[in-house]
């Protein structure tokens, strides 16, 4: 994720529960008086959770909020109180932004504390320096727990640098020996290392064993904090053109059983092909679908390692991931967040029969779904509606992940600036019940948007209506 700027339910629930209990008791008595060949009645293993008991997460992007929080515990206390008063139960505080530096303590070699982040200040994109010496993450933990909020650490995963007009940051810029960690993209000009492509976020190659070890070691240090959960963001490949390094080529050929791909990379993906090109293909190159399967396995295996790393330090920390809800095209970044019980190949031509095996939902304690639809598309059953994203996510995860929460990006949802402010405000209100009714919780990105447009009251109205 990235920030850009430009009723009567409780009574019904209790009544329904009482009917279930009474019916179960009567059937128990009948069964006790009957023979073995009587009817076998089955009942749901769980009773639907009331919305009031479902978590409501708000994400706190590091860069976007840095001007407020980098050096002020008072501002942290102020805004966490606003989140609590609005009805949010959980915060996700970003402590490893896209440059790959950190806002907590770690002894892993090569890791560095964030010195500055680029943020919009009074209409100008500027450097915001961190001069405070107190522990950034610990400040959120202390105040969050004091307020009764659960505190999760948001962790940008497969990133190692960021270059902009303000300057370059991250281990990939600081240490030239780590260039092989950077992803190599299949461009029209040839396979090119990310560090030779100019500015922007620099992704690691997820298939690189050294990268995986580096990330897992950092996660172990993060797990030493008294946090309630860890949410991995960008736990993925950089895009459809990634990764075509020799490291990944050899691993893929081994995955194929030792096959040598003669026309590399065109037998997988034509040089420079984009997602638009891929989605327009009537037939795929020879190894394309197997390549998608392989990439999904790479991410599955990494997620298993990351979970083990966290749990080895503190088994009580909830391990989670943020993903985009657009599953139909999320193969672009090599991620299968569904359950292995969801047979992807039955629905999508790009999926092999074995693609489903690398759905990682069962590895998670919590899954945040970006239900990033337009404010004009809150309700529905399909992708690109908020409610549809959440319903589909629950179906695809098949109960493997016990907590699936989804919700909107309330700042980047109207790229054409065609929706009125009143409609946006109403969409925030409506989004809460639309998403919470469809899954296990609500998730809003990002705190900065509620602050900038003074929209806390609409989030509160939506939460109050959803849980009444």
Regions flagged by a language model, labelled:
Residues 354-468:
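Substrate-binding cleft of secreted/luminal carbohydrate-active enzymes
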């Amino acid at each position: 994720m990235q920030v850009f700027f430009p009723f009567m339910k409780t009574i019904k629930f209790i009544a329904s529960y009482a009917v279930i209990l009474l019916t179960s008791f009567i059937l128990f008595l009948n069964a006790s008086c009957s023979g073995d060949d009587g009817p076998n009645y089955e009942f749901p293993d769980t009773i639907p959770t009331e919305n009031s008991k479902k978590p409501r997460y708000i994400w706190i992007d590091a860069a976007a909020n840095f001007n407020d929080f980098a050096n002020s515990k008072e501002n942290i206390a102020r805004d966490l109180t606003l989140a609590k008063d609005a009805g949010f139960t959980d915060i996700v505080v970003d402590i490893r932004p896209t440059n790959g530096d950190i806002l907590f303590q770690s002894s892993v070699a090569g890791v560095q504390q964030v010195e500055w982040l680029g943020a919009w200040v009074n209409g100008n994109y500027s450097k915001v320096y961190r001069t405070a010496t107190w522990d950034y993450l610990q400040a959120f933990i202390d105040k969050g727990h004091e307020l009764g909020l659960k505190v999760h650490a948001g962790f940008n995963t497969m990133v190692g640098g960021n270059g902009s007009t303000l300057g370059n940051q991250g281990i990939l810029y600081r240490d030239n020996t780590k260039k092989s960690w950077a992803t190599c993209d299949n461009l029209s000009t040839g396979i090119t290392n990310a560090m030779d492509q100019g500015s922007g976020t620099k992704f690691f190659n997820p298939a690189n064993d050294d990268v995986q070890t580096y990330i897992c070691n950092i996660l172990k240090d993060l797990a030493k904090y008294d946090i309630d959960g860890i949410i991995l963001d960008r736990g993925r490949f950089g895009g459809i053109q990634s990764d075509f390094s020799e490291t990944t080529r050899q691993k893929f050929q081994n995955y194929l059983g030792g096959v040598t791909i003669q026309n590399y990379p065109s037998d997988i993906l034509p040089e420079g092909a984009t997602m638009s090109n891929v989605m327009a293909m009537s037939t795929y190159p020879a190894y394309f679908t197997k390549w998608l399967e392989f990439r999904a396995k790479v991410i599955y295996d990494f997620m298993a390692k990351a979970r083990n790393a966290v749990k080895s330090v503190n088994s009580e920390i909830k391990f989670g991931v943020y993903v985009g809800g657009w599953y139909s095209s999320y193969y672009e970044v090599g991620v299968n967040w569904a359950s292995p019980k969801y047979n992807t190949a039955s629905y999508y031509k790009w999926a092999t029969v074995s693609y489903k095996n690398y759905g990682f939902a069962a590895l998670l304690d919590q899954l945040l779904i970006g239900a990033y639809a337009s404010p004009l598309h809150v309700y529905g059953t399909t992708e690109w509606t908020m409610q549809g994203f959440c319903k589909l996510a629950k179906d695809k995860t098949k109960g493997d992940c016990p907590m699936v929460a989804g919700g909107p990006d309330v700042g980047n949802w109207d790229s054409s600036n065609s929706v009125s402010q009143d409609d946006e405000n109403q969409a925030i209100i409506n989004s809460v019940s639309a998403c919470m009714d469809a899954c296990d919780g609500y998730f809003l990105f990002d705190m900065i948007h509620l602050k900038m447009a003074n929209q806390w009251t609409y989030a509160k109205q939506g939460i109050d209506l959803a849980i009444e």
